[in-house]
Amino acid sequence: MKKVQVKVIREEGVELPKYETEGSAGMDVRANIKESITLKSLERILVPTGLKVAIPEGYEIQVRPRSGLAIKHGITMLNTPGTVDSDYRGELKVIVVNLSNEAYTIEPNERIGQFVLNKIEQIEFVEVEELDSTERGESGFGHTGK
């Protein structure tokens, strides 16, 4: 398992992110808030996690929504997946949005998202006159049907 250094600046009682099952790809991350926050319909907010991390070079952390919050309450994230770069050292925060028609209250220590550690590789673009051809060609959105 890859080790990632973390500086914790969380409120008392807020748990560190953890994998909820043995096969989980993402670690559930919690709201580092002292008091409940109520999001009105279509409102968005930046929720602190209380964590600063030192991601190893060549990796990123992706910030993703939790499927249960999305299907049950219409709560998801903007800028999904969000990328945390290896050279960022500030507090990790999550952009939460309420897409439902009803207000939703985020409680202190509530699981609000997931962190997934991914290996990345930087690329360099090389300008060419023509690209090699493929069977698909330039067929884009909806090219395979419904």
Swiss-Prot record:
Cofactor list: Mg(2+)
Catalysed reactions listed for this entry: dUTP + H2O = dUMP + diphosphate + H(+)
InterPro entries xrefs: dUTPase, dUTPase-like, dUTPase-like_sf, dUTPase_trimeric
Superkingdom of source: Bacteria
GO molecular function terms attached to this record: dUTP diphosphatase activity; magnesium ion binding
Function: This enzyme is involved in nucleotide metabolism: it produces dUMP, the immediate precursor of thymidine nucleotides and it decreases the intracellular concentration of dUTP so that uracil cannot be incorporated into DNA.
Protein name per UniProt: Deoxyuridine 5'-triphosphate nucleotidohydrolase
Upper lineage: Bacteria, Fusobacteriati, Fusobacteriota, Fusobacteriia, Fusobacteriales
